[in-house]
Amino acid sequence: MLLVYIHKNSPRLKYIFDLFIGKLMGISYETTQNVEEFKSYAGPKFNYSEHQIENEIFIYSERLLFEKGIEDQQFGFTEWDGIKAFYATHPKYSVPFDLFSASFYLVSRYEEYLPHLRDSHDRYNETESIAYTRGFLQKPVVNIWAQKFKSIILERYPNLKSANSKYKYISTIDIDNAYAYLEKGLMRTIGAYGRSLINFDLPQIVERTKVLMRLMHDPYDTYDLMHDLHRRYKINVIYFFLLGEYGENDKNVSVDNRNFQSLIQSLADYADTGIHPSYGSNIKQGRLQKEVQLLTKILKREVTKSRQHFLKIRLPDTYRQLISVDIKEDFTMGYAGNIGFRAGICSSFYFYDLDQEVQTPLVIHPFAVMDATFRYYLKVNPEQVIDLIKPLLEEVKAVNGTFISLWHNESLSENHIWKGYRSIYEELLKIASA
């Protein structure tokens, strides 16, 4: 057991200690505010306070974990053996920065509560983040810091028992649009033909007609292909279904469509499933609950997983709404505009509500890469995608974290927009499962 001296306790401190020491370092710990108890303890220990006591491992504590509410944070930057860090303290200390405050700042998404600009979809922009501006968005620094600090502890206390986590890969698939042409209903189909005529898009008219006449496979119907790939590479997969009312940014097949319901049920036979809360659910109250109830009815079982359509998160409101409808796990934590680690971590963690100063029961699973990021935001050629994924994957494997990818059924269609992305996905499964 590891004993930690603290000069003061707080909900924030307990939260980050449980995550950082308990989960990431795999070490059981207790805290004490009694200096004499700490000095007389002969076992493994370190000091997290404002003053060093003897010659123990010492981390200077900044104010963040003992504050309440949101305040502008002033911190210095440093590097720790080449790894970027902030809340810098002094090079003479065992660790030259307050790694617990820095970790809490990132994982709690403290900066997303501060004043910031939002994008056209009312999302926090990655360019506002400290990870982006300081150049460590592509590194799971919280995991790296935990691994390095664990080495310091074990070097002094080699007999201290600790657990080691194992690397894991999870593929997640968003079904925003189950089919390109099928099951759209008469009015939507007529409207689509009209738009194609106005745009002189003859190839799409021909393709749509062939699919509707069953002379050609619907290009977005890639479900058998995905099943074969996931089975071949022994992949854990989660499908998220968009069941929102039709709107400008919510254009899936109607939830009343029996073939769509059958598709959902068939995918749920061999994979985990979750709700993909619609764009509209972030605007109109009550929609989220309705969508969860619809999926529950189709699956005939409790729905506990979610990922926001368009990755729309507004803290703490979005997560509070999920908790209110009994969602237990969310997979939205990532950026649309860039790849990497939005919360600086590649392991799951509980959402800490900074407004209420409480650890919630909602588990956050951060993802690292999304197909649409490469295609629409980074605008890279398909040949470059795997080379951008590999370094992130290596970072996650090095710290025994969890690598989560976000793909869509339509990006495996090999249509003109997604040409080359089918082979990219298979290569991703191959290297991520190795």
What residue spans do the PLM features occupy?
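Short acidic/histidine-rich active-site segments
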Residues: G274-H276, T332-G334, L406-H408
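Conserved hydrophobic/aromatic pocket- or pore-lining residues that grip, position, or stack substrates
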Residues: D174, H276, L322
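Terminal accessory/targeting
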Residues: M1-V255, S347, L354, V358-A434
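Catalytic domains of cell-wall/extracellular-matrix polysaccharide-remodeling enzymes
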Residues: L13, S281-V358, H416-W418
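Metal-dependent polysaccharide deacetylase catalytic core of the NodB/CE4 family, i.e.
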Residues: N177, Y181, L202-Q204, D224-I313
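Glycine-centered flexibility motif
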Residues: Y270-G274, N338-R342, G401
